[in-house]
Amino acid sequence: VKNGLYENVPAPRVKEKKVFQADPLIGWTTYPLSYAPVFVSRTETDPMSEENKYSMLVNVTEDIANHPDALILNRGYYGMNLKTDTSYRLSLFLKSRNYSAPVRVFLVDELGQQVSNVIEVNIENRDWTKYTGELKPEKNVQRGMLAIQPMSKGQFQIDVVSLFPSDTWNEGKSVFRKDIVQNLKAFAPCFIRFPGGCIVHGVNEETMYHWKKTLGPIENRPGQWSKWAPYYRTDGIGYHEFYELCEYVGADAMYVMPTGMICSGWVKQSPQWNFRHIDVDLDAYIQDALDAIEYAIGDTTTKWGAERAKNGHPAPFPLKYIEIGNEDFGPVYWERYEKIYQALSAKYPDLVYIANSVIRVVGRENDDKRKDIPNFVNPKNVKVFDEHYYNSIEWACEQHYRFDNYKRGVADLFIGELGISGKYPYNLLATGAIRMSIERNGDLNPLFAERPVMRHWDFLEHQ
């Protein structure tokens, strides 16, 4: 959703340590590429805050007067679509090390030519200082960039660069792109599943989704490495913004909570990283989920309900579903599911709780995945069962009658993720075969989550 639904157009800010294969400076470069006396790197020195431990160090090594075209560029997500009828609200944090001169900030086109007014700020403060301004393009540019131009030799630090169009949804008061929210409203989803799939469990406890770290000012949100490289999560769409989006489009909210289990696929397929299911304090995860629910629907006299009100929303949010884990399965999962379900449903019995299923068992692709539930847990405690499918066009077409054979009176059906690989438009037609089977079996009370609802066409996963 970056540079799409969440309309902060620069690429991720430079904060997180390098994790696995991701580049912490993704989106940033210096210009001209052949030679420029301007160098950028990630630094841990003098961070903005305890939450925000990393920033970008700019080192200008020569007199910039001899290199008037030297720039630091942020290309956004494969280029910024700049429009003359929109102004762009700039904010960034700067800190001098030994730099005492202005820097100029402006927009450029694909060739690096200036296409907007210039915001000039003096960097003399050795403390982190926030600077703001407004940039207005002079022409439409499909793949523009944000340019930062040093004016002197020396070193300074940059962090949390933000560039929002002034016409976001809700009269510019939200972080959401107006036309996409309007399209979502027209699509009229009954619910929105958040934060989604693999973001929930990550590949270790650090990279799991921790909702409390996504609240408050963006500069205090640490963000996190994303399994879907090449970029990091900024968590600009945090836990609070998720519920705002649900309200904007008239959808119920489905929050997917972590169970303390990491991505089972990585445990199985990536032994070189020593991924393994870890021992965690399950009571802490249960309390965290209870806090999350309280933030969403708790009275303002409660701790987290009061926090929601402090963040501008005293009324409860439209939370209806809690999914316990994402693609977690096996005896360990069911043991945790039972404990989590008992604790959450005891306090919030009106919410709908959803269990996970194994993604794929070779040789049993056509089985009713729910038939193993009694082997692990009381079936009465599984009200809705989430099945995920990633397979070929041929397989999808064979599933047209799949749900006709499902046993009735068991858990309700939820297809939380469906990915059919193959060429367009045949993959869409094959997806339609499964959807027809779901609709034909309405007595299973089916739920279906589109995945993905949107994507950046220059960066496609699960093509």
Describe each region flagged by the PLM.
Residues V200, M261-S264, V410-Q463:
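Aromatic/acidic polysaccharide-binding cleft in carbohydrate-active enzymes
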Residues V1-T234, D252, Q269-D283, P331, ...:
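Extracellular and organelle-lumenal recognition/adhesion modules and their flexible linkers in secreted
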Residues R13-K15, R97-A101, I199-V203, M261-W266, ...:
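Flexible loop/turn segments at secondary-structure boundaries
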Residues Q224-K227, Y231-G236, E241-E244, P331, ...:
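Glycoside hydrolase catalytic-domain groove-lining segments
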Residues L135-E138, R143-A147, T168-C190, T234-V249, ...:
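An active-site-proximal structural segment forming one wall of the substrate-binding cleft
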Residues Q149-M151, D159-V160, P165, P195-C198, ...:
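Active-site groove signature of glycoside hydrolases
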Residues F194, V256-P258, T302-G312, Y341-R370, ...:
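Aromatic-lined carbohydrate-recognition surfaces of secreted/lumenal glycan-active proteins
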Residues A186, F191-R193, D252-M254, P316-E323, ...:
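Structural preference for beta-strand elements that scaffold enzyme active sites
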